[in-house]
A protein has these predicted regions:
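Acidic, surface-exposed loops and disordered segments
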Residues: 1-151
Length: 151
């Protein structure tokens, strides 16, 4: 697809032509991957997962990659639901310039939702997901992103 055709297609289908991101997920050779993912530096489970339900999911999904290295997600877990928030701790911006953090945190939360879906499916937990639009300014600490009803 030529650049001009892609631009026209994106505009026709309602995509902002300046905002495109893609993530590839694939199985890689064992010798190309981290030997022990639990040795990587991530936020502790209690910092991102509120509640005692489904912690086995939280213990894995907390390893979701983060562009800003801020891991901007919080989950409130109940027996039959998960509520996901984009979380921005005041003064924390990771490796990104301050004016780019909100943009990349929105991308990070999308990647997190993908990993959360995959973890739920791997554990054979059925779900329905409701997504919420994030049009907030950068001054909000928690923004409702998704609600999962667990089946």
């Amino acid at each position: 697809v030529s650049g001009e055709n892609l631009y026209l297609w994106k505009n026709y289908n309602g995509f902002d032509p300046d905002f495109v991101i893609m993530i590839a997920i694939a199985k890689v050779a064992d010798d190309k991957f981290r030997k022990d993912m639990f040795k990587s530096k991530r936020k502790p489970i209690d910092e991102i997962w509120n509640g005692e339900h489904h912690r086995e999911i939280g213990k894995i999904v907390r390893f979701t990659p983060s562009a800003c290295n801020t891991q901007p997600w919080k989950v409130t877990a109940e027996e039959k639901s998960l509520t996901v928030y984009r979380y921005k701790k005041s003064g924390k911006r990771g490796i990104m310039p301050a004016d780019k953090v909100a943009h990349y945190n929105r991308i990070d939360i999308g990647i997190f939702l993908c990993f959360l879906d995959l973890c739920l499916m791997e554990n054979r937990i059925g779900f329905e997901r409701e997504l919420f639009t994030d049009n907030t300014k950068d001054d909000c600490e928690e923004v409702l992103t998704a609600k999962y009803t667990l089946l």
